[in-house]
Amino acid sequence: NGKVLRKQLVKDLHEQYFAITKGEEIVEYKARRSMLLVPSYNKHNVEKARTVLADTLIFDLEAILEDQRELARETLKDIYKEGGAKFGESERVLRVNNLGSEDLKKDLALAKEIELDALLFSKIDTKEDVLEAVKLIEGINPNLTLMIMIETPLSVLNIQEICAASSKVEVVVVGSNKLANRLQIDIKRGSKAIVTYLAHIALAAKAYGKTVIDGPHFDVKDEFACEDSTKDAFNLGFDGKSLVHPIQIEYINDIFTPKQSEVEDYEDMINKYEEANKHGKEVILHNNRLVDSSRIAWARKMIKLYETYKALGQNLFGK
């Protein structure tokens, strides 16, 4: 049964980190291909989140109306009390409100009451914002993963210092809709109009070893536009994409998963590179492309991911 195997895949992804060899450095990798935004005032949506196959669930307390936020907090507490803390095998993230707000204080109080894996801080614009978020999360639970939202022109301008501010920050999530609104750019059909800014964010995040997640595609009925946007994100170096509806999960996961044909090419490339290394060569030509050690590190990472997914039925997602 394909659905059962995919559920087992998500389960195993969140029981382990992948140790990936990058030269002599071991890099830990946690799958966050799909991050589903869940409006937490809606009890039906929160309960349904227990059954979806997203790598990560983001219980959203920020992108809702101000007068819905108290209801959202109470809804989360009730659902945890009624059904327990487990939401399938998905990572559980609470998206909290802006630094300095009264809502943030209430959000952080909730974070002490329910079991979570991470906090996502909204509207991080400066390195000082990062340090404040670090201080707050350490005061709640230092074992929680710290994630931050990049959603303003100022945050894009400051992205390098934001990423450099603290090793505690593990994940950078782009709030592409708010960013586009502030830039007065229409991204209803996709994110190509802000690709320059997305590339800048991805570059800085990767330079400082962060996982970087693209913003959602809001037209849930336009599957092709969403796939196109997801492919753009993958090609820019993003590790995953946030989304607003479970219908988008499977093909987003698929795009961020290595394919069999790609892995076969990577294996051939590694074999040729290792043979060339024996003769003192550090760069080879493979399929008319120059390959050096950094490309080999990428290939090994993709092979490791593919092998893990395949062992759990990932081959069902196609070749």
Q: Can you name each region flagged by the protein language model?
A:
Residues 1-26:
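AMP-binding adenylation
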Residues 26-319:
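Expand to "…catalyze enediolate/carbanion chemistry for C-C bond making/breaking, isomerization
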